[in-house]
């Protein structure tokens, strides 16, 4: 059962020391009334902010001078206790302006030639190195907070491995006799340092109460280093759609978090853009959608706000949050304490690729997830520790070469009847350029041409055969006798565009003959000879999406657990609530539109009509109804397939199948 409260607010309070009269307008009743209006059952309040200011009388840090002795944190905690609202405590770990002003030598330095780790556009905030004496100070601050307040949870912010070249890190490398010119030595040290930090801070958090929750926030849960997730007692998936994460980041993050066995929540914001935006509001419909989306993935919710320095709560903000959480309160019983169902497993490039990704927006992972979301597939995201049991198809997007360890694991999976879909260089050995599985093809190298063309044997969108341009890297394959089907062909252009030879505005047209197979099938699955996931992430090419979907459909056949005619901007989950003897299909739909300079906005929530759902369940279904209003839905069940039709819904619906 759930331990984390389900409707939380993360109340930022990063407040400059140059502002006076801090908390002067704090009013306990107004604070409580806003929490009630917001349907909030937990609020994270501040002990220490990024500026290094403490919001209670502290012996280990600098109390904000503008408080003039007022213990704001204690006042907030008392207000929460009186109305039964949970109140974990926030401590800024990686940023502390006050400390760095006094100890500039403790700054983290990202490159040998730089003087600090740059965090644009947050001018003024600079990371502190955990190999400096600051870590002792931070630990003492945490110990003071838990001894004084005994909170149920501690949120430690700006905490993830950061490569650092400060004098403390250089000294460690030197003492170990390692090469200071080798960047990998500093990468390895950053991971070791983060573990040291986590071990010490976790011990401090639990020094009073071993059941105190702790979360270290780094803005993303890393599948590259999955062990780090377990430094936390739970996961808070920071994902502000308008703050740089985008609307498709949270579903990707939640699908991965669900595999780790920890409770998790989705963290969005009430802001039009991102953290620290005073006076910024998104449309209420956007926040309703984000709460519904979060809960549909089995996640609790947290909404970010920032309190005014004077300590009063913004009434409009809590009216906005209340609209979203009123809906969340109504649907949470059908979403939380559930297990997600899957047909497809995606091996994460972030975890499996030889080279680590350069950002959290890895094109190979982003592209394949977009295709699967838009195709309404049930899928999970897998790191190196994940089991492959139970998946009907495993997808290896673009750059997952096969180590001996992975080969052994995949062989076992294939022996049990599974199928593979590989794109790009996935499926090739790490030791030499050859396929390690039977896709009915031999690998012959990377194409010399870009772009190239795919000529499919299927009819994309009902169009007749043609040669469709693909801009991502293409790979040359040759058909083998074991090939069971060539599903598409590859064609080259007359030449690559150069100053010496070019044609028209873009690129040369295709030659009138095939280079060879573009998609091949063998006994182990299918291979697509382009970085097709990256193609979809970068260009949004409809042919790329259609190619992956059509290939998947041939592999999975009639074995899909659920089929639904939801539009491509929708999200679908199927969750099992075993203790309540039911399955719940969650359908969520809105269409973000870019407004301004790339900001995605949700304004209108469009009503959808005649949504048909077919679910294959092993149990006999007794009843089907809407979770939002408990109204009955007519259904049929034949050969295990339960068929039901929604005449209409707006934004979200939970379709409940009682067994």
Per-range role (PLM):
Residues 19-38, 59-83, 196, 402-406:
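Aromatic- and glycine-enriched glycan-recognition loops and surfaces
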């Amino acid at each position: 059962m759930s331990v984390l409260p389900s409707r939380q607010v993360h109340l930022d309070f990063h407040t400059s020391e140059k502002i006076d009269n801090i908390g002067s307008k704090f009013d306990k009743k107004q604070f409580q009334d806003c929490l009630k209006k917001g349907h909030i059952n937990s609020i994270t309040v501040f002990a220490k902010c990024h500026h290094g200011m403490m919001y209670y009388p502290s012996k280990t840090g600098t109390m904000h001078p503008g408080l003039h002795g007022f213990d704001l944190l204690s006042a907030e905690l008392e207000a929460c206790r009186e109305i039964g609202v949970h109140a974990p405590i926030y401590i800024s770990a990686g940023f502390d302006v006050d400390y760095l002003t006094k100890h500039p030598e403790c700054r983290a330095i990202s490159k040998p030639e730089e003087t600090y780790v740059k965090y644009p556009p947050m001018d003024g905030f600079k990371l502190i190195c955990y190999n400096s004496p600051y870590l002792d100070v931070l630990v003492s601050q945490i110990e003071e907070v838990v001894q004084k307040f005994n909170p149920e949870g501690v949120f430690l912010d700006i905490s993830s491995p950061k490569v650092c070249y400060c004098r403390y890190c250089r000294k460690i490398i030197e003492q170990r006799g390692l090469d200071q010119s080798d960047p990998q030595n500093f990468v390895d040290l950053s991971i070791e340092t983060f573990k040291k930090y986590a071990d010490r801070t976790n011990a401090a958090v639990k020094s009073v109460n071993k059941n105190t929750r702790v979360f270290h926030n780094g803005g993303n849960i890393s599948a590259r280093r999955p062990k780090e997730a377990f430094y936390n007692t739970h996961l808070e998936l920071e994902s502000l759609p308008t703050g740089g994460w985008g609307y498709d980041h949270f579903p990707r993050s939640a699908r991965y978090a669900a595999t780790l066995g920890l409770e998790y929540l989705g963290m969005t914001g009430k802001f039009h853009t991102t953290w620290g935006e005073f006076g910024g509001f998104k449309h209420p419909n956007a926040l309703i959608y984000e709460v519904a989306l979060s809960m549909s993935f089995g996640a609790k919710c947290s909404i970010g706000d920032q309190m005014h320095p004077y300590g009063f709560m913004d009434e409009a903000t809590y009216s906005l949050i209340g609209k979203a959480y009123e809906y969340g309160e109504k649907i949470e019983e059908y979403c939380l304490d559930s297990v997600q169902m899957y047909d497809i497993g995606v091996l994460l490039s972030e975890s499996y690729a030889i080279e680590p990704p350069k950002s959290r927006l890895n094109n190979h992972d982003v592209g394949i997830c977009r295709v699967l979301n838009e195709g309404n597939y049930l899928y999970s995201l897998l790191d190196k520790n994940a089991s492959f049991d139970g998946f009907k198809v495993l997808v290896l997007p673009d750059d997952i070469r096969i180590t001996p360890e992975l080969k052994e694991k995949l062989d076992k999976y294939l022996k049990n009847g599974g199928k593979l879909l590989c794109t790009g260089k996935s499926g090739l050995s790490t030791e030499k350029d050859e396929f390690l599985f039977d896709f009915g093809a031999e690998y012959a190298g990377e194409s010399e041409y870009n772009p190239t063309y795919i000529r499919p044997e299927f009819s994309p969108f009902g169009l007749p055969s043609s040669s469709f341009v693909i801009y991502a890297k293409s790979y040359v394959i040759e058909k083998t006798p074991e090939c069971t089907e060539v599903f598409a062909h590859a064609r080259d252009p007359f030449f690559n565009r150069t100053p010496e030879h070019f044609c028209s505005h873009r690129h040369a047209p295709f030659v009138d003959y095939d280079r060879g197979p573009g998609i091949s099938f063998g006994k182990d699955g299918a291979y697509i000879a382009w970085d097709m996931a990256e193609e979809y992430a970068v260009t949004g090419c409809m042919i790329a999406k259609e190619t992956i979907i059509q290939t998947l459909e041939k592999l999975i056949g009639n074995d899909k657990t659920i089929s639904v005619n939801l539009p491509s901007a929708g999200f679908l989950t199927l969750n099992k609530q075993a203790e309540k003897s039911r399955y719940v299909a969650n359908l969520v739909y809105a269409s973000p539109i870019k407004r301004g300079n790339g900001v995605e906005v949700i304004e209108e929530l469009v009503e959808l009509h005649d949504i048909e759902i077919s679910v294959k369940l092993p149990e006999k279904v007794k009843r089907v109804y809407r979770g939002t209003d408990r109204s009955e839905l007519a259904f049929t069940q034949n050969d295990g397939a339960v068929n039901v039709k929604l005449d209409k819904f707006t934004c979200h619906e939970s379709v409940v199948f009682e067994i």
